[in-house]
């Protein structure tokens, strides 16, 4: 166990793992230029600054996962969506975290 894990604990990805198993609506909230540099296949790019303008895209989705570069913008996006009545949102954190969790699930199944 490394020092960061000891100090801050291990990230609990159980909500992310469950959401990934249910064909989620994947939303990359990074900027278009960041998105163009690579993302998850099938993810939609809705930058954090545009989330409020696209609330209708989130309605009637059973599972929503938002992610970004570090997890900060996706946390803000989750908060914005919840303030607008969208409650089934999981903050996937970083793009790297979502990809690693997807790979873990693929290896388990």
Model-inferred region functions:
Residues 68:
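Short cysteine clusters
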């Amino acid at each position: 166990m490394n020092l960061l894990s000891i100090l801050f604990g291990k990230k609990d990805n159980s909500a992310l793992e469950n959401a990934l198993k249910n064909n989620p609506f994947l939303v990359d909230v990074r900027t278009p230029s960041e998105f163009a540099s690579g993302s998850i296949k099938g993810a939609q790019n809705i930058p954090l600054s545009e989330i409020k303008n696209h609330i209708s895209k989130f309605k009637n989705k059973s599972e929503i996962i938002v992610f970004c570069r570090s997890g900060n913008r996706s946390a803000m996006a989750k908060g914005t969506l919840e303030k607008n009545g969208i409650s089934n949102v999981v903050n996937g954190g970083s793009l790297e975290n979502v990809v690693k969790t997807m790979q873990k699930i693929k290896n388990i199944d």
